[in-house]
Amino acid sequence: MSPTGTPATPALQHRTVLLDEAVDALVWRPDGVYVDGTFGRGGHSRAVLARLGPDGALVAFDKDPAAIAEAGTIKDARFSIEHASFAAMAERLAGRGHVAGVLLDLGISSPQIDEAARGFSFRFEGPLDMRMDTTRGITAAQWLAQADEQDIARVIRDYGEERFAVQIAKAIVARRSESGDGGPVATTADLAALVAKAVKTREKGQDPATRTFQALRIHVNQELEDLERGLKAAYDLLQVGGRLVVISFHSLEDRIVKRFMAAHARPQQDADPALRRAPLRAADLPQPTLRLLGRYKPGAEEVAANPRARSAVMRVAEKLAPAGGGARA
């Protein structure tokens, strides 16, 4: 049973990464309003609700219709769910005032990976979809059928950090031209086989298609753009003392989170060339507005129980009062 009494789904179980650590860092006042930006299968949300008092509230977000359906099993008046990206939290929460904490768990869930029809994994043959929200947008297969070679190479290089991005893009376009139907790379197996031929060297312990699949998923879902928008929205929504907790699973995400938090955690002399040249005292500089509370990794026991947790990194920051003071509520 879940912390809120909801029966767990027996199939395609998702192990919530850094569950206790994330909730401990997030919930600092039981009567606060909190945001779970990535409901997934509800592990973090249920644990947060278990920590809240009767006057607390939790608003969750998710793009995935399956996650929205799962959220419907939570019968708790303190809980609500928005079928939207967390990047839209500022608009969706307009009028609710500031919040006590925002949690973003950026990992793709095990049910999403393991469901062949979603097209996220090269381990299962299925349509090359890759959309988090299957009700809108174009699929990975549709994008590959129409994008030019340079764009395909750029996406695979920038979002997959793939050395053979140019060769993979050439192979995709060549297959497209040979087939004459404009879309030969239609399944996960099609793409995995094509990448395996294009990648000339192998990384130990990693399938050659790993980086390409990651890149296409990030692109199709605009994950990095959403992350940048979501971090800004979360920062703006947080009350003084509020917590921002972000769990990332690859270096591209973690780099964005690290830079965002660091930029708000130091005096902003670098933001203005005039300030860089001026002999200002620290007290004269724009003051930090976030306090960094730590960086965390799953322990050996958690990784042994859930190997997918190995790459997780959690960063935590606290909103500070602006110079001259500020309201905490």
From Swiss-Prot:
It is an enzyme of class 2 (transferase). Its EC number is 2.1.1.199. S-adenosyl-L-methionine binds at G42, G43, H44, D62, F86, D105, Q112. Coiled coil: none annotated. Keywords: Cytoplasm, Methyltransferase, rRNA processing, S-adenosyl-L-methionine, Transferase. It is found in: Cytoplasm. InterPro entries: RsmH, SAM-dep_MeTrfase_MraW_recog, SAM-dependent_MTases_sf. One of its GO terms (biological process) is rRNA base methylation. GO terms for cellular component: cytoplasm. Its main location: cytoplasm. One of its GO terms (molecular function) is rRNA (cytosine-N4-)-methyltransferase activity. It comes from the Bacteria. It catalyses: cytidine(1402) in 16S rRNA + S-adenosyl-L-methionine = N(4)-methylcytidine(1402) in 16S rRNA + S-adenosyl-L-homocysteine + H(+). Specifically methylates the N4 position of cytidine in position 1402 (C1402) of 16S rRNA. Belongs to the methyltransferase superfamily. RsmH family. This is Ribosomal RNA small subunit methyltransferase H.
